C-alpha cells in the first residue's frame, strides 16, 4: 500500500485534521497544537484499499510514531471492530515501529452493541488505545 506523503489528504503539519465522509455528520477531529507534529492522513476504505472493506481513515503522526485507525459508523459497532482489524492488517507492514490506536465514531449505537463480547475482547486487548465516541 502506498502511504507516501504525496497521497496524504493533508499538508505536513496542519493545525487540525478532520476525518469525515461526504454527506455524513459523523467526524473525527484531531488537533495538532502549535502545528508541532508531522501528520499524514489517508482515506482507506474504497480508495487506498479496494479489495475488502476496512476502516475509513488512517491518521499518522510521524513525529511520535503513532497511527490512528478511524471508523465512522452508524450503529454496527461489531462490524466497525472488524473494519479496524482489516485496516490494521493492511497498514501494519508499511508502519513497522508505529503504535496503533483505534477510534470508532458512532451515532446510533445502543449500549448492548458497545458491550458485545467481540467489542469487549478488542477493548481488553488494546485498552486505552481503543476508544468509542458517540455523537448525536
List each model region and its residues:
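Histidine-anchored nucleotide/phosphate-binding helix
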Residues: 82-95
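Solvent-exposed, charged helical/coil patches
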Residues: 1-36
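Domain-level recognition of nuclease-like catalytic cores that cleave nucleotide substrates
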Residues: 1-9, 101-136
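Active-site-adjacent loop/helix micro-motif of nuclease/hydrolase catalytic cores
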Residues: 49-50, 76-84, 112-115
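Conserved catalytic cores of phosphodiester-cleaving nucleases, focusing on short active-site segments
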Residues: 57-59, 66-74
